[in-house]
């Protein structure tokens, strides 16, 4: 095959790969599985409690976010009040700490009143979306921990954005 033709074939394949990746990351399917390397795997349908499979290995040192389902509604701003469903696990042992899904009622609060990891990780998310947050201790509960969360614990949250005001 001539060199120019081969280059064109690779260019077309690259464009198709990017288009496919863009479609699937922009909410092409409400049942989402998989994650970026090193992050927890999150599965489940929109409107239902997620299933989280924590990864093994060292926790990331910086805040990590990943849209599992991309919402199409109102965007979260730093000044927003949110209504969300969430699930919280600890990185160190994969223990479920808390889930609003268990009580059946979502939580409502001003974004300015929660941990730094949420304040920095949720703006830009939209109603109808599901976002994974992996929050290092310095943006969570720090060296003291809080209740069942131990000192210097990395937190895994999956947050479904229900309403923004």
Model-derived segments and spans:
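Cross-family detector of peptidyl-prolyl cis-trans isomerase
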Residues: 1-165
């Amino acid at each position: 095959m001539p060199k120019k033709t081969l280059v064109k074939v690779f260019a077309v394949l690259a464009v198709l790969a990017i288009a496919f990746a863009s479609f699937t990351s922009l909410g092409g399917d409400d049942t989402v599985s998989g994650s970026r390397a090193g992050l927890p795997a999150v599965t489940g349908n929109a409107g239902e409690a997620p299933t989280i499979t924590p990864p093994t290995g060292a926790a990331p040192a910086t805040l990590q976010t990943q849209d599992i389902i991309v919402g199409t509604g109102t965007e979260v701003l730093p000044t927003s009040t949110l209504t969300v469903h969430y699930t919280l696990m600890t990185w160190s042992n994969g223990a479920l700490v808390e889930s609003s899904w268990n009580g059946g009622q979502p939580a409502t609060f001003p974004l300015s009143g929660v941990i730094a990891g949420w304040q920095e990780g949720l703006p830009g998310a939209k109603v109808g979306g599901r976002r994974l947050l992996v929050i290092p201790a310095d943006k969570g509960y720090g060296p003291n921990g809080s209740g069942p969360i131990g000192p210097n614990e990395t937190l895994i949250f999956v947050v479904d954005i229900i309403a923004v005001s």
